[in-house]
Amino acid sequence: MSDKLLTIDLSHVYGFDKEIIFKKYQKKVDQIHQDFLAHKLADGHMTGWYDQPDQNHQFLLKTINQIDKKFKSLKVTDIVYVGIGGSFTGIKTVLDFLKPKQRTGLKIHFVPDLSAFQAASVIKEIKNKSWALITTSKSGRTLEPALNFRIFRNLLNKRYGNKHYQRVVVITDEKKGLLTKMASNHGYQKLVIDSNIGGRFSTLSPAGLLLAKLFGHDPKAILKGTLQAKKDLQTTSLENNSAYLYAVVRHWLYTTKKFKIEVCIAYHSLYEYLLLQHRQLFGESEGKNDKSLFPTFSIFTVDLHSMGQLYQEGEKVFFETVIDVKNPLVNINLPPSDFDNDDELDFLLDKSLNEISDVAIDSVIKAHYQANVSIIKLTLKEQSAFMFGYFYFWLSVATVMSGSLLGHNVFNQPGVEVYKKLMFEKLRSGH
Protein backbone atom coordinates (compact mmCIF):
# COMPACT_ATOMS: atom_id res chain seq x y z
CA MET A 1 0.00 0.00 0.00
CA SER A 2 1.17 3.58 -0.68
CA ASP A 3 1.52 4.58 2.95
CA LYS A 4 2.95 7.91 1.94
CA LEU A 5 -0.28 8.87 0.17
CA LEU A 6 -2.74 8.11 2.97
CA THR A 7 -2.11 6.90 6.50
CA ILE A 8 -4.56 5.90 9.19
CA ASP A 9 -3.67 6.48 12.84
CA LEU A 10 -5.67 4.52 15.42
CA SER A 11 -3.48 5.29 18.43
CA HIS A 12 -6.21 7.51 19.89
CA VAL A 13 -9.03 4.96 19.64
CA TYR A 14 -9.87 3.71 23.13
CA GLY A 15 -9.92 -0.06 23.52
CA PHE A 16 -8.64 -0.80 20.03
CA ASP A 17 -6.65 -4.04 20.03
CA LYS A 18 -5.34 -4.78 16.55
CA GLU A 19 -4.91 -8.49 17.09
CA ILE A 20 -8.43 -8.98 18.45
CA ILE A 21 -10.09 -6.77 15.81
CA PHE A 22 -8.24 -8.38 12.92
CA LYS A 23 -9.14 -11.85 14.15
CA LYS A 24 -12.80 -10.86 14.54
CA TYR A 25 -13.21 -9.16 11.17
CA GLN A 26 -10.72 -10.51 8.62
CA LYS A 27 -12.86 -13.40 7.34
CA LYS A 28 -15.93 -11.16 7.06
CA VAL A 29 -13.91 -8.63 5.07
CA ASP A 30 -12.55 -11.35 2.79
CA GLN A 31 -16.07 -12.60 2.02
CA ILE A 32 -17.55 -9.14 1.38
CA HIS A 33 -14.63 -8.30 -0.90
CA GLN A 34 -15.17 -11.50 -2.90
CA ASP A 35 -18.92 -10.86 -3.14
CA PHE A 36 -18.30 -7.28 -4.25
CA LEU A 37 -15.96 -8.30 -7.06
CA ALA A 38 -18.35 -11.09 -8.11
CA HIS A 39 -21.30 -8.64 -8.14
CA LYS A 40 -23.05 -10.71 -5.48
CA LEU A 41 -23.87 -7.83 -3.14
CA ALA A 42 -27.38 -6.35 -3.32
CA ASP A 43 -27.54 -4.27 -6.53
CA GLY A 44 -24.05 -5.61 -7.10
CA HIS A 45 -24.02 -4.45 -10.71
CA MET A 46 -23.67 -0.82 -9.52
CA THR A 47 -19.90 -0.95 -9.59
CA GLY A 48 -19.13 1.18 -12.62
CA TRP A 49 -17.19 3.61 -10.45
CA TYR A 50 -14.92 0.77 -9.31
CA ASP A 51 -14.24 -0.33 -12.89
CA GLN A 52 -13.59 3.23 -14.07
CA PRO A 53 -9.87 3.58 -13.18
CA ASP A 54 -8.89 0.70 -15.51
CA GLN A 55 -10.87 1.96 -18.49
CA ASN A 56 -9.60 3.83 -21.53
CA HIS A 57 -10.55 7.49 -21.08
CA GLN A 58 -9.05 8.90 -24.28
CA PHE A 59 -12.37 9.65 -25.99
CA LEU A 60 -13.86 11.23 -22.87
CA LEU A 61 -10.77 13.37 -22.25
CA LYS A 62 -10.72 14.43 -25.91
CA THR A 63 -14.39 15.47 -25.70
CA ILE A 64 -13.77 17.37 -22.47
CA ASN A 65 -10.87 19.21 -24.09
CA GLN A 66 -13.09 20.12 -27.04
CA ILE A 67 -15.76 21.55 -24.74
CA ASP A 68 -13.10 23.54 -22.90
CA LYS A 69 -11.76 24.97 -26.17
CA LYS A 70 -15.28 25.75 -27.40
CA PHE A 71 -16.20 27.65 -24.25
CA LYS A 72 -12.95 29.60 -24.48
CA SER A 73 -13.65 30.47 -28.12
CA LEU A 74 -17.11 31.66 -27.07
CA LYS A 75 -15.39 33.74 -24.37
CA VAL A 76 -17.52 32.13 -21.66
CA THR A 77 -16.89 33.85 -18.32
CA ASP A 78 -19.60 32.19 -16.22
CA ILE A 79 -20.82 28.61 -15.82
CA VAL A 80 -24.27 27.90 -14.38
CA TYR A 81 -24.21 24.38 -12.97
CA VAL A 82 -27.48 22.60 -12.20
CA GLY A 83 -27.40 19.40 -10.16
CA ILE A 84 -28.37 18.00 -6.77
CA GLY A 85 -27.18 15.29 -4.38
CA GLY A 86 -23.93 13.67 -5.48
CA SER A 87 -24.18 15.55 -8.76
CA PHE A 88 -23.75 18.77 -6.78
CA THR A 89 -21.74 17.81 -3.71
CA GLY A 90 -19.09 15.98 -5.70
CA ILE A 91 -18.53 18.83 -8.14
CA LYS A 92 -18.28 21.38 -5.35
CA THR A 93 -15.88 19.09 -3.50
CA VAL A 94 -13.36 18.71 -6.31
CA LEU A 95 -13.43 22.42 -7.20
CA ASP A 96 -13.02 23.50 -3.58
CA PHE A 97 -10.27 20.98 -2.86
CA LEU A 98 -8.26 22.34 -5.79
CA LYS A 99 -9.40 25.95 -5.58
CA PRO A 100 -5.94 27.48 -4.94
CA LYS A 101 -4.96 26.37 -8.47
CA GLN A 102 -8.20 27.40 -10.14
CA ARG A 103 -7.88 29.32 -13.40
CA THR A 104 -8.91 32.95 -13.36
CA GLY A 105 -11.48 34.48 -15.68
CA LEU A 106 -14.17 31.86 -15.12
CA LYS A 107 -16.80 31.79 -12.39
CA ILE A 108 -19.18 29.00 -11.42
CA HIS A 109 -22.72 29.49 -10.13
CA PHE A 110 -24.34 26.51 -8.43
CA VAL A 111 -28.13 26.16 -8.50
CA PRO A 112 -28.69 23.03 -6.39
CA ASP A 113 -32.11 23.45 -4.78
CA LEU A 114 -35.53 25.13 -4.80
CA SER A 115 -34.29 28.46 -3.44
CA ALA A 116 -35.86 31.28 -5.45
CA PHE A 117 -33.33 33.64 -3.88
CA GLN A 118 -30.40 31.56 -5.12
CA ALA A 119 -31.79 31.31 -8.65
CA ALA A 120 -32.63 35.03 -8.75
CA SER A 121 -29.16 35.91 -7.48
CA VAL A 122 -27.52 33.85 -10.21
CA ILE A 123 -29.79 35.37 -12.85
CA LYS A 124 -28.74 38.81 -11.68
CA GLU A 125 -25.04 37.90 -11.67
CA ILE A 126 -24.97 36.44 -15.19
CA LYS A 127 -26.91 39.27 -16.77
CA ASN A 128 -24.86 40.66 -19.65
CA LYS A 129 -22.21 37.97 -19.12
CA SER A 130 -21.13 35.33 -21.61
CA TRP A 131 -22.35 32.18 -19.91
CA ALA A 132 -22.94 28.48 -20.42
CA LEU A 133 -25.23 25.92 -18.79
CA ILE A 134 -24.22 22.47 -17.54
CA THR A 135 -26.58 20.02 -15.88
CA THR A 136 -26.21 16.51 -14.49
CA SER A 137 -29.14 14.14 -14.03
CA LYS A 138 -29.39 10.52 -15.13
CA SER A 139 -33.16 10.56 -15.50
CA GLY A 140 -33.75 14.24 -16.16
CA ARG A 141 -36.81 13.92 -13.92
CA THR A 142 -35.41 14.85 -10.50
CA LEU A 143 -37.56 17.85 -9.71
CA GLU A 144 -35.05 20.35 -8.34
CA PRO A 145 -32.55 20.24 -11.23
CA ALA A 146 -35.34 19.83 -13.79
CA LEU A 147 -37.01 23.07 -12.63
CA ASN A 148 -33.75 24.98 -12.59
CA PHE A 149 -32.70 23.64 -15.97
CA ARG A 150 -35.95 24.90 -17.46
CA ILE A 151 -35.46 28.36 -15.93
CA PHE A 152 -31.89 28.77 -17.12
CA ARG A 153 -32.33 27.05 -20.48
CA ASN A 154 -35.12 29.52 -21.23
CA LEU A 155 -32.83 32.40 -20.29
CA LEU A 156 -30.07 31.01 -22.47
CA ASN A 157 -32.47 30.65 -25.38
CA LYS A 158 -33.73 34.21 -24.98
CA ARG A 159 -30.14 35.46 -24.94
CA TYR A 160 -28.61 33.39 -27.74
CA GLY A 161 -31.59 32.10 -29.72
CA ASN A 162 -30.91 29.24 -32.13
CA LYS A 163 -27.23 29.25 -31.11
CA HIS A 164 -27.96 28.57 -27.46
CA TYR A 165 -27.21 24.87 -28.01
CA GLN A 166 -23.50 25.73 -28.27
CA ARG A 167 -23.54 26.67 -24.59
CA VAL A 168 -25.37 23.66 -23.14
CA VAL A 169 -23.82 20.45 -21.82
CA VAL A 170 -26.00 17.69 -20.41
CA ILE A 171 -24.46 14.84 -18.42
CA THR A 172 -26.85 11.93 -18.30
CA ASP A 173 -27.62 8.31 -19.15
CA GLU A 174 -26.39 6.99 -22.47
CA LYS A 175 -29.76 5.96 -23.88
CA LYS A 176 -32.57 6.82 -21.46
CA GLY A 177 -34.05 9.90 -19.85
CA LEU A 178 -35.41 13.31 -20.73
CA LEU A 179 -32.00 14.96 -21.07
CA THR A 180 -30.97 12.40 -23.68
CA LYS A 181 -34.06 13.33 -25.71
CA MET A 182 -33.36 17.04 -25.31
CA ALA A 183 -29.76 16.60 -26.42
CA SER A 184 -30.90 14.72 -29.51
CA ASN A 185 -33.64 17.22 -30.36
CA HIS A 186 -31.63 20.40 -29.83
CA GLY A 187 -28.05 19.39 -30.54
CA TYR A 188 -26.74 19.78 -27.00
CA GLN A 189 -23.35 18.36 -26.15
CA LYS A 190 -23.90 15.20 -24.12
CA LEU A 191 -21.56 13.35 -21.80
CA VAL A 192 -22.53 9.92 -20.50
CA ILE A 193 -22.75 8.67 -16.93
CA ASP A 194 -22.84 4.89 -17.04
CA SER A 195 -26.09 3.44 -15.75
CA ASN A 196 -24.17 1.34 -13.21
CA ILE A 197 -22.82 4.38 -11.34
CA GLY A 198 -24.98 5.85 -8.58
CA GLY A 199 -25.03 9.57 -7.84
CA ARG A 200 -22.90 9.58 -4.69
CA PHE A 201 -20.29 7.45 -6.46
CA SER A 202 -20.26 9.63 -9.59
CA THR A 203 -17.93 12.50 -8.67
CA LEU A 204 -15.21 11.22 -10.99
CA SER A 205 -17.61 10.56 -13.83
CA PRO A 206 -17.67 13.07 -16.74
CA ALA A 207 -19.36 15.66 -14.50
CA GLY A 208 -16.44 16.04 -12.12
CA LEU A 209 -13.79 15.66 -14.79
CA LEU A 210 -15.36 18.26 -17.10
CA LEU A 211 -15.72 20.89 -14.39
CA ALA A 212 -12.18 20.18 -13.21
CA LYS A 213 -10.85 20.77 -16.72
CA LEU A 214 -12.86 23.95 -17.25
CA PHE A 215 -11.38 25.42 -14.08
CA GLY A 216 -7.80 24.59 -14.96
CA HIS A 217 -7.23 21.26 -13.23
CA ASP A 218 -5.89 18.07 -14.77
CA PRO A 219 -8.48 15.30 -15.23
CA LYS A 220 -5.70 12.86 -16.08
CA ALA A 221 -4.08 13.44 -12.69
CA ILE A 222 -7.40 12.81 -10.94
CA LEU A 223 -7.86 9.55 -12.85
CA LYS A 224 -4.28 8.50 -12.07
CA GLY A 225 -5.09 9.00 -8.40
CA THR A 226 -8.07 6.65 -8.63
CA LEU A 227 -5.97 4.05 -10.42
CA GLN A 228 -3.29 4.19 -7.73
CA ALA A 229 -5.92 3.86 -5.01
CA LYS A 230 -7.42 0.83 -6.73
CA LYS A 231 -3.99 -0.79 -6.95
CA ASP A 232 -3.29 -0.07 -3.29
CA LEU A 233 -6.65 -1.47 -2.19
CA GLN A 234 -6.57 -4.79 -4.06
CA THR A 235 -5.60 -6.69 -0.93
CA THR A 236 -8.16 -7.66 1.67
CA SER A 237 -5.56 -7.67 4.44
CA LEU A 238 -6.59 -5.30 7.21
CA GLU A 239 -2.90 -4.76 7.82
CA ASN A 240 -2.46 -3.30 4.32
CA ASN A 241 -5.88 -2.03 3.18
CA SER A 242 -6.51 1.21 5.09
CA ALA A 243 -9.97 1.74 3.56
CA TYR A 244 -11.16 -1.63 4.84
CA LEU A 245 -9.49 -0.98 8.19
CA TYR A 246 -11.34 2.33 8.50
CA ALA A 247 -14.62 0.57 7.69
CA VAL A 248 -13.95 -2.11 10.29
CA VAL A 249 -13.07 0.39 13.03
CA ARG A 250 -16.22 2.42 12.29
CA HIS A 251 -18.29 -0.76 12.54
CA TRP A 252 -16.59 -1.81 15.77
CA LEU A 253 -17.07 1.62 17.35
CA TYR A 254 -20.77 1.51 16.42
CA THR A 255 -21.63 -2.10 17.29
CA THR A 256 -19.25 -2.84 20.17
CA LYS A 257 -18.48 0.54 21.72
CA LYS A 258 -22.06 1.73 21.05
CA PHE A 259 -21.21 5.14 19.60
CA LYS A 260 -24.08 6.59 17.58
CA ILE A 261 -22.38 9.55 15.90
CA GLU A 262 -19.24 10.05 13.81
CA VAL A 263 -17.96 13.63 13.66
CA CYS A 264 -15.71 14.08 10.65
CA ILE A 265 -13.32 17.00 11.10
CA ALA A 266 -11.07 19.06 8.83
CA TYR A 267 -9.04 22.16 9.56
CA HIS A 268 -9.77 24.30 6.51
CA SER A 269 -13.00 25.75 5.16
CA LEU A 270 -11.98 24.59 1.67
CA TYR A 271 -12.60 21.04 2.86
CA GLU A 272 -16.17 21.59 4.03
CA TYR A 273 -17.60 19.88 0.97
CA LEU A 274 -15.11 17.04 1.32
CA LEU A 275 -16.73 16.44 4.70
CA LEU A 276 -20.17 16.76 3.13
CA GLN A 277 -19.16 14.14 0.60
CA HIS A 278 -18.07 11.85 3.43
CA ARG A 279 -21.45 12.48 5.06
CA GLN A 280 -23.38 11.64 1.89
CA LEU A 281 -21.39 8.52 1.03
CA PHE A 282 -21.84 6.98 4.46
CA GLY A 283 -25.22 8.50 5.31
CA GLU A 284 -26.97 7.50 2.11
CA SER A 285 -25.29 4.10 1.89
CA GLU A 286 -25.78 3.10 5.54
CA GLY A 287 -28.85 4.95 6.76
CA LYS A 288 -31.19 1.97 6.56
CA ASN A 289 -33.21 -0.37 8.78
CA ASP A 290 -32.69 1.83 11.85
CA LYS A 291 -29.10 0.59 11.97
CA SER A 292 -26.38 3.10 11.18
CA LEU A 293 -23.96 5.65 12.48
CA PHE A 294 -25.08 9.25 12.13
CA PRO A 295 -22.33 11.01 10.14
CA THR A 296 -21.85 14.71 10.74
CA PHE A 297 -18.92 17.13 10.52
CA SER A 298 -17.15 20.17 11.90
CA ILE A 299 -14.64 22.65 10.52
CA PHE A 300 -11.92 23.39 13.06
CA THR A 301 -10.72 25.64 14.50
CA VAL A 302 -13.85 27.70 13.73
CA ASP A 303 -16.28 25.21 15.29
CA LEU A 304 -14.12 24.87 18.39
CA HIS A 305 -15.47 28.29 19.33
CA SER A 306 -19.05 27.03 19.13
CA MET A 307 -19.04 23.23 19.53
CA GLY A 308 -15.67 22.79 21.22
CA GLN A 309 -17.22 22.84 24.68
CA LEU A 310 -19.57 20.00 23.78
CA TYR A 311 -16.81 17.92 22.19
CA GLN A 312 -14.61 18.39 25.25
CA GLU A 313 -17.09 17.98 28.10
CA GLY A 314 -20.41 16.87 26.60
CA GLU A 315 -21.82 13.35 26.61
CA LYS A 316 -19.52 11.01 24.70
CA VAL A 317 -21.99 9.55 22.24
CA PHE A 318 -19.62 10.22 19.34
CA PHE A 319 -16.17 9.48 17.99
CA GLU A 320 -14.12 11.68 15.68
CA THR A 321 -12.49 11.13 12.30
CA VAL A 322 -9.91 13.82 11.57
CA ILE A 323 -8.82 14.44 7.97
CA ASP A 324 -5.43 16.16 7.88
CA VAL A 325 -4.25 17.30 4.43
CA LYS A 326 -0.51 17.90 4.33
CA ASN A 327 1.43 20.13 1.92
CA PRO A 328 -1.38 22.62 1.22
CA LEU A 329 -1.09 24.68 -1.94
CA VAL A 330 -1.05 28.02 -0.11
CA ASN A 331 0.83 29.23 2.94
CA ILE A 332 1.52 32.55 4.69
CA ASN A 333 4.22 33.39 7.23
CA LEU A 334 3.42 35.74 10.09
CA PRO A 335 5.14 39.04 9.21
CA PRO A 336 6.88 41.45 11.60
CA SER A 337 4.47 43.89 13.20
CA ASP A 338 4.18 47.42 11.80
CA PHE A 339 2.84 48.47 15.20
CA ASP A 340 5.64 47.65 17.65
CA ASN A 341 4.24 44.20 18.56
CA ASP A 342 1.20 45.71 20.27
CA ASP A 343 -0.66 42.47 19.50
CA GLU A 344 2.06 40.55 21.40
CA LEU A 345 2.45 37.92 18.69
CA ASP A 346 6.18 38.21 18.05
CA PHE A 347 6.70 34.83 19.72
CA LEU A 348 5.17 33.40 16.53
CA LEU A 349 7.31 35.51 14.20
CA ASP A 350 8.12 33.80 10.91
CA LYS A 351 5.95 30.79 11.71
CA SER A 352 3.48 29.93 8.98
CA LEU A 353 -0.27 29.65 9.35
CA ASN A 354 0.03 26.02 8.29
CA GLU A 355 2.60 25.31 11.01
CA ILE A 356 0.32 26.89 13.59
CA SER A 357 -2.61 24.87 12.22
CA ASP A 358 -0.59 21.67 12.64
CA VAL A 359 0.01 22.55 16.29
CA ALA A 360 -3.72 23.16 16.68
CA ILE A 361 -4.52 19.73 15.22
CA ASP A 362 -2.15 17.95 17.58
CA SER A 363 -3.37 19.96 20.58
CA VAL A 364 -7.06 19.35 19.89
CA ILE A 365 -6.51 15.62 19.39
CA LYS A 366 -4.63 15.48 22.70
CA ALA A 367 -7.30 17.49 24.54
CA HIS A 368 -10.21 15.47 23.17
CA TYR A 369 -8.45 12.17 23.77
CA GLN A 370 -7.84 13.18 27.39
CA ALA A 371 -11.60 13.76 27.58
CA ASN A 372 -12.24 10.13 26.52
CA VAL A 373 -13.00 10.84 22.87
CA SER A 374 -11.91 8.11 20.44
CA ILE A 375 -10.24 9.61 17.38
CA ILE A 376 -9.36 8.14 13.98
CA LYS A 377 -6.85 10.27 12.08
CA LEU A 378 -6.54 10.11 8.29
CA THR A 379 -3.51 11.92 6.88
CA LEU A 380 -3.43 12.78 3.18
CA LYS A 381 -0.01 13.41 1.67
CA GLU A 382 -0.87 16.55 -0.28
CA GLN A 383 -3.49 18.86 -1.71
CA SER A 384 -3.49 17.90 -5.39
CA ALA A 385 -5.66 16.59 -8.21
CA PHE A 386 -3.98 13.19 -7.89
CA MET A 387 -4.65 13.09 -4.14
CA PHE A 388 -8.29 14.04 -4.63
CA GLY A 389 -8.82 11.16 -7.04
CA TYR A 390 -7.05 8.83 -4.65
CA PHE A 391 -9.02 9.84 -1.58
CA TYR A 392 -12.43 9.89 -3.26
CA PHE A 393 -11.91 6.35 -4.54
CA TRP A 394 -10.60 5.33 -1.11
CA LEU A 395 -13.73 6.73 0.58
CA SER A 396 -15.99 4.93 -1.89
CA VAL A 397 -14.29 1.60 -1.19
CA ALA A 398 -14.50 2.20 2.57
CA THR A 399 -18.20 3.01 2.21
CA VAL A 400 -18.98 -0.28 0.46
CA MET A 401 -17.20 -2.31 3.13
CA SER A 402 -18.65 -0.35 6.04
CA GLY A 403 -22.24 -0.59 4.83
CA SER A 404 -21.88 -4.24 3.89
CA LEU A 405 -20.64 -5.09 7.39
CA LEU A 406 -23.98 -3.71 8.61
CA GLY A 407 -25.82 -5.92 6.13
CA HIS A 408 -27.11 -3.03 4.02
CA ASN A 409 -27.59 -2.56 0.30
CA VAL A 410 -24.98 0.18 -0.08
CA PHE A 411 -26.06 1.19 -3.59
CA ASN A 412 -29.70 2.17 -3.12
CA GLN A 413 -31.52 4.96 -1.30
CA PRO A 414 -35.19 3.96 -1.03
CA GLY A 415 -35.85 6.43 1.78
CA VAL A 416 -35.21 9.35 -0.55
CA GLU A 417 -38.10 8.25 -2.73
CA VAL A 418 -40.65 8.67 0.08
CA TYR A 419 -40.66 12.47 0.09
CA LYS A 420 -40.47 12.59 -3.71
CA LYS A 421 -43.62 10.47 -4.03
CA LEU A 422 -45.55 12.59 -1.54
CA MET A 423 -44.35 15.83 -3.10
CA PHE A 424 -45.33 14.84 -6.62
CA GLU A 425 -48.74 13.63 -5.43
CA LYS A 426 -49.39 17.01 -3.81
CA LEU A 427 -48.09 19.01 -6.76
CA ARG A 428 -50.11 17.04 -9.31
CA SER A 429 -53.28 17.33 -7.22
CA GLY A 430 -52.85 21.08 -6.84
CA HIS A 431 -52.17 20.48 -3.11
From Swiss-Prot:
One of its GO terms (biological process) is gluconeogenesis. The active site is at E284, H305, K420. InterPro entries: G6P_Isomerase, Phosphoglucose_isomerase_CS, SIS_dom_sf, SIS_PGI_1, SIS_PGI_2. Keywords: Cytoplasm, Gluconeogenesis, Glycolysis, Isomerase. It catalyses: alpha-D-glucose 6-phosphate = beta-D-fructose 6-phosphate. GO terms for molecular function: carbohydrate derivative binding; glucose-6-phosphate isomerase activity; monosaccharide binding. Its main location: cytoplasm. Pathway: Carbohydrate biosynthesis; gluconeogenesis; Carbohydrate degradation; glycolysis; D-glyceraldehyde 3-phosphate and glycerone phosphate from D-glucose: step 2/4. GO terms for cellular component: cytosol. It is found in: Cytoplasm. CDD domains: SIS_PGI_1, SIS_PGI_2. The keyword Cytoplasm applies. Its EC number is 5.3.1.9. The keyword Hydrolase does not apply. Catalyzes the reversible isomerization of glucose-6-phosphate to fructose-6-phosphate. Belongs to the GPI family. This is Glucose-6-phosphate isomerase. It comes from Mycoplasma genitalium (strain ATCC 33530 / DSM 19775 / NCTC 10195 / G37). The gene is pgi.
